[in-house]
């Protein structure tokens, strides 16, 4: 099996239709806009929610055999009891806090589940803050530098949810064969 590189934007339905004209059997939907700036809220809705809608609907129409949707730990919410560790069954409880990244990743999961109910074979992954070789996000490096100097002033109860890129890649590959459709991990 081969692959073809197609440049486009997930929020542009025409671009997504062009990509799915190739009838891909396996789809990794990893596109998303990570930001906690209020000024990015509208763009996040376009990319994270409408882009996900485009990909899921086109994957269903194309008859894709498996879709792996990269969501985020931010779509899970926060446990009701401080210090409790959340799992994939945690109900989203961050609505109304003005966190558009969290809200849009959760809404994207609702779009994914809607398409699962329509017959799409899709698995969701919820990694934490991804870091590793090739990481271009300076704020991740700043966190580690601060920790190494003893200068990280606050760590939330339950810790910081870091995910090594190698583990995230392994999870995506495992999701192809082992993930249960409609579930998140």
What positions do the PLM features span?
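NAD(P)H-binding glycine-rich loop region in Rossmannoid oxidoreductase-like domains
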Residues: 3-50, 58
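Conserved catalytic-site region of short-chain dehydrogenase/reductase
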Residues: 36, 73-83, 130-136
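Alpha-helical substrate-binding/gating segment
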Residues: 144-152, 158-185
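Conserved cofactor-binding/catalytic machinery of classical short-chain dehydrogenase/reductase
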Residues: 12, 26, 51-54, 66, ...
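NAD(P)-dependent short-chain dehydrogenase/reductase
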Residues: 118-161
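Conserved Rossmann-fold NAD(P)-dependent oxidoreductase catalytic core, especially the SDR/UDP-sugar
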Residues: 47-101
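Active-site Tyr-X1-5-Lys
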Residues: 96-124
């Amino acid at each position: 099996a081969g692959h073809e590189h197609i440049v486009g934007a997930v929020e542009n339905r025409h671009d997504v239709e062009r990509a799915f004209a190739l009838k891909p059997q396996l789809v990794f939907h990893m596109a998303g806009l990570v930001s906690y700036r209020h000024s990015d809220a509208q763009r996040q809705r376009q990319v994270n929610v409408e882009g996900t809608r485009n990909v899921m609907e086109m994957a269903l129409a194309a008859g894709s055999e498996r879709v792996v949707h990269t969501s985020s730990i931010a779509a899970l919410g926060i446990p009701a009891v401080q210090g409790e560790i959340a799992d994939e069954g945690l109900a989203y409880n961050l609505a109304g806090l003005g966190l558009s990244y969290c809200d849009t990743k959760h809404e994207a999961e609702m779009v994914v589940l809607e398409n699962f109910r329509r017959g799409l074979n899709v698995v969701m992954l919820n990694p934490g803050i991804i870091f590793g070789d090739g990481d271009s996000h300076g704020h991740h490096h700043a966190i580690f530098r601060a920790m190494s100097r003893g200068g990280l002033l606050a760590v939330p109860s339950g810790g910081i949810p870091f995910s090594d890129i190698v583990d995230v890649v392994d999870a995506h590959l495992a999701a192809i064969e082992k993930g249960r459709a409609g579930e998140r991990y």
